Amino acid sequence: MKIDAYISYKQLLKYNCTTTQTIIGKAECFKDILFDENQPRFTDWALSLDLVKKYKFYYQQAVLVDVYQQKDSITKNPQKGVRGMEMLFEKHKDAILSDKEIVESFFKKKASFVCKTDKNPKEEMKIIFKYNPTAGNFIKYLLAALGVYKYIFNIKQKF
């Protein structure tokens, strides 16, 4: 198996690139670090974040599995997505807030789930703008504050 690169804790916080079907490791790693049974969504990401803090994580670019979502999959439940992101933030808050790129990536992901619950991601856009005050992020925050962001998001999802 060719290993392409090492993945750091901060890289994994910024981009969730793991699924349970693709994690390979020694049994002792998984006996030491367990799934958080209370995590309603992103259990693979939560587990990987815990593992990467203690063990070296590498990835291989080659596609090794096909993944299919079933109709009743938890990935189709946006409320669980919002709660899962909240729990990840509570656990990794300091690391997330230490890097504006991680803040933006993390809260954009959370905002997408908020929009799917038919709410505006005002708080998420506010945090993004606070940590990365660009004109674009101000406009996104303003759109969310005015209640328009979710409509634009949902229109974009249809195309």
What are these regions (language model features)?
Residues 1-84:
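Conserved nucleotide-sugar donor-binding catalytic segment
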Residues 63-159:
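C-terminal subregions of glycosyltransferases and related glycan-biosynthesis enzymes
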